[in-house]
Amino acid sequence: MALNDLAAKEIFQNIDPDLDTLVGFSGGPDSTALLFGLHQLKINNRLNGKLAALHINHGINSQANAWESHCKQVAESLGITFFSEHVTIKSKSKSIEIEARNLRMEVFKAYSRDYKQICLAHHLDDQVETVLFRLFRGTGLRGITGIKLSRIIGEGFLIRPLLHTPKDALIDYLKSHNIDYLIDESNLDQSIDRNFIRKSVMPLIQSRWSAAANKIFDFSKLAHEEIEILDTLFENVYGHLFRSESLIKSELVNLDSPLRRKLIRHWLEFHKLPIPNLKILIEIEKTFLDSSSPNAEVQWSRSDDEQGVILRINKNEIYFEVI
């Protein structure tokens, strides 16, 4: 039961076959296709490390326990080691979706001690939705690069081997082999922004421009490549400024405004701090570079309120405090 050639090629190209692999398995169509695809590689001796599936039960939906049972049954039917973890959403002050994602990442980080390669089933359509969502919400150049193919998490890597594969290819594979998968009804709720983009915006766009999804995806890849080049050049010239613990006002005041803002963003990124939007960046410029108040400060936080920052100035040095 081979996954179609395109998806199978993408999976194999984007993973390390010698690492132990853990699949984030919700039971939905995407993660089901990924699990079966990796299982096919395993039985064909193209995946040398261990293969396991991890289901995270958020306990939100009334069907949550039934979904967990389904995932366990599927994994065991394939002879794949199965893990499940229950997480509890506590906060009511922020998006449930954001908190659920943060909790999942903590679980993945814990499992990275034993499984150095954690695979998630994001696909091309997810990438397109992410780019559009960020554009509509407001983002910079880095935001339009979308979802990363891979990144470090804990002691391993988080990889999305299907990121270049359209969802239709995954659905066709599942249907052609009569593979069951779960449907989360919340994904149909168009009061949720991403669902609205998926169910209403993209179909309308593609009814006019049939290749729109691929073009948006290619655009995000090109943006990523261009940003990498610019970052390298920028660091070669200005790296000594943003790698320090503080910014020196006298070294910034005579620079053009776009360059000053880029330096501030890179400085904050280097120290793994929340990146402010354009409005706050302009406020930072006015507060610290275009005036000289000794008690000035600018404060902001991440969109999920998990971390906040205050910038202050002491004579010629602009420094940060995490709150």
What are these regions (language model features)?
Residues 65, 94, 191, 210-213, ...:
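Non-catalytic, surface-exposed connector residues within folded enzymatic/regulatory domains
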Residues 37-44, 204, 267-270:
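Active-site catalytic microenvironments for nucleophilic, acid-base chemistry
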Residues 171-214, 218-221, 225, 232, ...:
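Mid-to-C-terminal catalytic subdomains of enzymes
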